[in-house]
A protein has these predicted regions:
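Positively charged, low-complexity intrinsically disordered leader regions
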Residues: 1-19
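Short amphipathic alpha-helical segments, especially helix-boundary/capping motifs
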Residues: 8-12, 33-36, 107
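Short, well-ordered coil/turn residues at beta-beta hairpins
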Residues: 9, 120-121
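Conserved N-terminal subdomain of the carbohydrate kinase-like
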Residues: 14-25, 40-120
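Short catalytic helix/loop segments, enriched in acidic residues and glycine
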Residues: 23-36
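An aromatic- and histidine-rich active-site surface loop
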Residues: 123-126
């Protein structure tokens, strides 16, 4: 059994960011941002995420930052489209265009313990 400071559970999101100037595609989600930040701060973490296997390349963000993770398959991947209405990005419309299968207790690895279990959900129903 392995022990971690934190186990972070949440969906990786394939984000589409639309501004008056351009369209960007990026990988986001609470699990990504918190895991990368905590890893660089020296925390012993494990990220647990779900996505459709066809979108597995999204996990490269964890590899680039040395974040250990477990990947669970889902029929869908979370995806959010943020449309910013002004160049200063003060106003936006946020649309969920995909959501992973809901997380359950069965998704928490039984061979891992942690001081803190962080549930990094992005939307109701995850």
């Amino acid at each position: 059994m392995t022990h971690h400071d934190l186990l972070i559970l949440g969906a990786v999101s394939k984000d589409i960011i639309i501004t008056p100037e351009n369209v960007e595609h990026s990988i986001g989600g609470a699990v990504v941002y918190s895991a990368v930040a905590l890893k660089h701060l020296g925390a012993n973490i494990l990220a647990v995420t779900k996505l459709n296997p066809e979108d597995r390349q999204a996990l490269e963000v964890f590899d680039r930052h040395g974040v250990p993770y477990r990947f669970l398959e889902s029929p869908t991947t979370t995806s959010i489209r943020n449309t910013y209405h002004t160049a200063d990005r003060d106003r936006r419309t946020c649309e969920a265009i995909g959501m992973v299968a809901p997380f359950t207790l069965d998704d928490v690895p039984d061979d891992v313990t942690a001081e803190v279990y962080y549930l990094g959900g992005l939307m109701k129903g995850e």
